[in-house]
Amino acid sequence: MIKLTPAMKQYYDAKKQHSDALIFFRMGDFYESFGEDAKIIAKELEITLTTRGKDIEGEKMPLAGIPYHALDNYLPRLIKKGYKVAICEQLEDPKKAKGIIKRGVVRVVTPGTAIDTSMFTDPSNNYLMSISGGDGDYGVSFLDVSTGEFLTTQFADKSPYDRIASEAARMRPSECIISRTMFSDERLVERLKELNVLVQGFKDEAFDVDSSRKLLERHFNVSTLEGMGCAGLPYATSSAGAALDYALTTQMRELGHVSELSTYSDSEFMMLDSITLRNLEIVKNVRGEGNDTSILKVLDDTNTPMGGRLLQKWLLKPLINVDSIDHRLDALECLANDTMLRFDVRSHLSFVKDIERLIGRVVYGNSNARDLIALKRSLGSVPQIVESMGDDPGCEMLINIRDGLLGFEQLENIVKLIDDAIVDEPPVSVREGGMIRSGYNEKLDELKGMSTGGKTWIASFQQKERDRTGIKSLKVGYNRVFGYYIEITKSNIAQIPDDYIRKQTMRNAERFYTPELKEWEDVILSADEKITALENELFTEITSRIASHASDLQRIAVLIGQLDCTASLAEVAVNNNFVRPNITSDCKILIREGRHPVVEKTVRGGFVPNDTEMDCVDEQFLLITGPNMAGKSTYMRQVSLIVIMAQAGSFVPASHASIGIVDRVFTRVGAFDDLASGQSTFMVEMVELANILNNATPKSLVLLDEIGRGTSTYDGYSIAKAVVEYIHNKGRVGVRSLFATHYHQLTNISSSLKRVKNYHIAVKEDGDDLVFLRKIVPGATDKSYGIHVARLAGVPHKVTQRAKEVLQDIEDESVISKESDSKRGRKKKSAQYTQLMLFDPEGSSAPVAEPDPVVEELKELDVNSMTPIEALNKLSELQKKAGKGGK
């Protein structure tokens, strides 16, 4: 076994402590990695893989490294790929170190605990998710280390996978921790991975309720968690405690900006599961790269990262309390109606940066001088924002925001502190120096004078030596290894004075120094070193003073986010002709001239608006027919998006809208084969349908598009009909539903189910051409126009012409069959033509069909015991009986 160098022993010690992480090991001006880590880093970062020395086994040691100043460029690339990286720093000044330099891991960066701004490509929250549970109760927590936001909840569910997946889909965490025991639950892990969440197993003891409670109480400096709302929620407490434990373990320092824990309940918000969020494209475009077609993209005209994050939360968690929704709508209306107020507020907001993350970096201890300048300019806009709002902004929410911004007395002092201390254009790194303004510190100014004077002397010394030696090319230079030197080209060596002392030999030149130059070098370098040390000391002092006001600054950030989010929605409403919805506690949904907020921006020739009227009593179930491409799916999505926008607190695309509160939106639209889990289109459809039928409440809104199309015609029709009956008859109050179908026979069901209403998308036939009018009108249609659509799609004329002939043959055969049946007076028993109820209406019983004797006799036959002749004779006998009607 090879004996390791002291530095490599440090590396192996760090790797042993953080075996699940890639090690970035500081060696001078580089971060280096060895062994398998080096191979991974070289591959992922596309950098050179080389070798240095031997490993423990005596083999060549793989090596990969990056310059220390390029860490912010390379580290995000590894984190975004799901790696955990441990940063091992030099813990002492190499110049002052006695023997081997002390090194140690100072932080571990993971996808869910990243805090550097270089990690984030958009202003969205970067949540760490934590899950705990048992015996049907589960706790879920979300911690954003970059902003300090901390949330927890608890719910009861014997089968929690859908619920947990829905929370993950709404909050979109980068990483999730679960206990190592729970990590064996493959179904849970897979559901989270399907949502692109990195799942990590964490020590079981971190999820202990008592340990979590004590950790939370100690961190927040409280004696009880009652004020945070989770004192009686053991799993909410344990998941929150584990999240905080993981964050503290990886960051290796106190997280003072994580100053509050908020407990929320699902009962406060409309439930939008992962399927609905995908199908409606609320915040993410599911059609791949390219133009963003999400509703968030349409509504987001925010000026600040805080406003952008809040808007996303509002859309993902719409409210279900009428007063709370109206509270938001009142503020939006004030801003929409007052053009000057809206313009002034938004103008000042445009100068505000990401205060939440800036404060997080300041408290965390990795901010730079440019962060402080950004914070100064952001906070400097607050008085102007308040002034633009005037004495009476016109509604409660805006008044509360203005008063909250006015209430922070230290705002002016913080702005003045940064303005006095930091230069207007500071360097990127605090290591570079030159960030503290002249006049802020007397000792620093004195040192700067010495450094400046010394450098002035260097310039005059260079000119003096040129004159003395007659060497015009003589120059005085500096590098970190050799210090200051006089450089003479080889062709002028004969002219050097006797007092020049050789320092370094180059290929084309020689470098020298004089006792006088050495003396001034000591003065300059000593001053520069002291300047750097003092600037760092002063910067730490300044950031500490700012960090002491972190909680107040975070509250300012929250208020600015609320104002920006509301002002953005007002701007979008005015620019897009949206109207304020009337929110009610009943179940009626009335929309006049509703429009799809995304499609109307992209459709050619103008969007055709449509009305919607539904409730739980008379117009509960809208059965929509019409050809493919006519707009059935767009119409249904349009209704649901208007409802979601309204309850999020936004104006809506319509001329009038009255929305009865919806507690949950269910969607079964589109078809995505779940190949990864081995589920076919039809299986996925049935799983999603089962979720809807089992969980919809009288307050829900259900969207079903082409149920049954993933199987045979008869099976599909039967399932579709059964679903209509089940939803219609479920409870005394019907679930508001929109159901698009291509089974035209299904429209007859409205004659027996009184709350089912038929609608269809109007089309106009012009010879062989088909014009989609995009208008939804009452009544059913008996045509699908499939061949017309095929022609529009570019199917060859020969194929569509043959399809018309086949269709005509089928229709003729159907007519002949009906006439023949009529003449014989036979009763039609086919499920295709008979309105038999697959689910009985409440309080009634379905008639029992009389068994067919031919069928019964056929069932009783023992074919295996019969000879071929006996079988043929029996078949002939049964055929004769069947020909006589079976009796």
From Swiss-Prot:
GO terms for biological process: mismatch repair. Keywords: ATP-binding, DNA damage, DNA repair, DNA-binding, Nucleotide-binding. Coiled coil: none annotated. CDD domains: ABC_MutS1 (cd03284). Gene3D superfamilies: 1.10.1420.10, DNA repair protein MutS, domain I, MutS, connector domain, P-loop containing nucleotide triphosphate hydrolases. GO terms for molecular function: ATP binding; ATP-dependent DNA damage sensor activity; damaged DNA binding; mismatched DNA binding. ATP binds at G626, P627, N628, M629, A630, G631, K632, S633. Belongs to the DNA mismatch repair MutS family. This protein is involved in the repair of mismatches in DNA. It is possible that it carries out the mismatch recognition step. This protein has a weak ATPase activity. NCBIfam families: mutS1, PRK05399.1. This is DNA mismatch repair protein MutS. It comes from Methanococcoides burtonii (strain DSM 6242 / NBRC 107633 / OCM 468 / ACE-M).
